């Protein structure tokens, strides 16, 4: 009888321990889409997975590549993904329609957008006005091209004098190299790496950043599905915190970050991702604004100006407010977003 009681007690204790363990290790599933392929600019998210930052927050994150920085909006709107990376300026235009889901950005990844026009130096295209009379290749789904109208307005270009050819992502840089177009619209680091990897020297490549000619826009941001955001605010908060930790870790340990990329993207190589990583960190991620205010910082006055600027080339029917587009309620404290001195002074 004593043995039976002892055995029952042991079984009860084991069962309780099992329940306790399953509760302790319960993970909230999160479906997350990147804006593009597994490449260095998004390495912080991959590092957060590989180094267990999401897991430590109780999140089970599924990470998928994307099809362009506009498509992420559709993925979140449909509910097929809880979170996605996308161009915040395209979100501004999307939210102009009150019938569309109330998607918001919860983390600004790209403080300075990579939107650019790339050409060969020999073409003589040195300023935006030089694009008049030229043939420009641009994928319709590209985030940079999505902001073309705002760019030509800000830069004083006569859009009627620029011929645009809709090209696919895979043939964009090859068409430039073959001389089939005079210039291409893209994220600068994508075209730079493609052309450099094809053997072109830095001095042969000309990049016109749209932001240098009057465009005050932000770039890619993390967007949240409204239903998921409302039902799982803590999961969103934890995801943002772990992601910022991932980007700071990637900045401190670039080789680890690039290794995280290459394990998911065997088609790329270390040299290409090292170039892409450096260009992204130097030109798009660590701006003066971020060094001063921390990763993920958004200047509300600047965002308001960007909404106004988009409206100069896009006719609003229901102009969105800042609160329709972005919220900082999911950001961790400033101390967790601060840029360490060693990174702030670093040239990648």
Could you tell me what each predicted segment is?
Residues 170-174, 180-270:
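Pocket-lining segment of extracytoplasmic ligand-binding domains
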Residues 20-23:
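N-terminal signal peptide c-region/cleavage motif recognized by signal peptidases
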Residues 231-315:
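Secondary-structure end/capping motifs
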Residues 1-5:
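N-terminal secretory signal peptides that target proteins for export/translocation
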Residues 26-178, 182-189, 208-210, 215-216:
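Short, glycine-/small- and polar/acidic-enriched structural segments
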Residues 303-348:
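Conserved C-terminal helix/tail region of periplasmic/extracytoplasmic solute-binding proteins
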Residues 6-10:
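N-terminal export leaders
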Residues 159-163, 202-206, 267-278, 316-325:
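Short, surface-exposed acidic
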């Amino acid at each position: 009888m004593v043995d039976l009681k002892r055995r029952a007690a042991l079984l009860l204790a084991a069962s309780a321990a099992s329940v306790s363990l399953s509760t302790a290790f319960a993970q909230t599933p999160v479906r997350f889409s990147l804006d593009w392929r597994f490449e260095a600019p998004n390495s912080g998210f991959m590092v957060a997975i590989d180094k267990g930052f999401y897991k430590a927050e109780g999140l089970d994150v599924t990470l998928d590549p994307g099809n362009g920085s506009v498509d992420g909006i559709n993925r979140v709107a449909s509910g097929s993904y809880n979170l996605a990376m996308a161009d915040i300026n395209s979100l501004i235009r999307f939210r102009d329609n009150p019938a569309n889901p109330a998607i918001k950005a919860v983390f600004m990844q790209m403080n300075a957008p990579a939107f650019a026009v790339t050409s060969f130096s020999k073409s003589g295209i040195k300023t935006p006005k030089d694009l008049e009379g030229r043939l420009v290749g641009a994928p319709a789904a590209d985030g940079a091209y999505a902001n073309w109208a705002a760019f030509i307005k800000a830069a004083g270009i006569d859009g009627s004098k620029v011929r645009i050819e809709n090209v696919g992502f895979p043939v964009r840089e090859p068409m430039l190299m073959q001389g089939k177009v005079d210039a291409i619209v893209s994220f600068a680091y994508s075209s730079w790496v493609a052309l450099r990897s094809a053997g072109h020297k830095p001095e042969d490549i000309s990049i016109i950043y749209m932001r240098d000619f009057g465009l005050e826009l932000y770039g890619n941001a993390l967007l949240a599905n409204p239903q998921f955001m409302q039902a799982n605010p803590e999961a969103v908060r934890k995801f943002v915190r772990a992601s910022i930790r991932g980007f700071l870790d990637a900045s401190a340990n670039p080789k680890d970050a690039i290794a995280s990329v290459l394990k998911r993207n065997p088609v790329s190589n270390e040299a290409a991702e090292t170039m892409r990583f450096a260009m992204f960190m130097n030109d798009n991620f660590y701006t003066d604004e971020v060094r001063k205010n921390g990763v993920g910082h958004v200047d509300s006055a600047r965002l308001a100006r960007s909404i106004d600027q988009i409206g100069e080339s896009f006719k609003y029917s229901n102009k969105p407010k800042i609160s329709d587009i972005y919220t900082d309620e999911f950001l961790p404290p400033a101390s967790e977003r601060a840029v360490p001195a060693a990174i702030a002074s670093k040239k990648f």
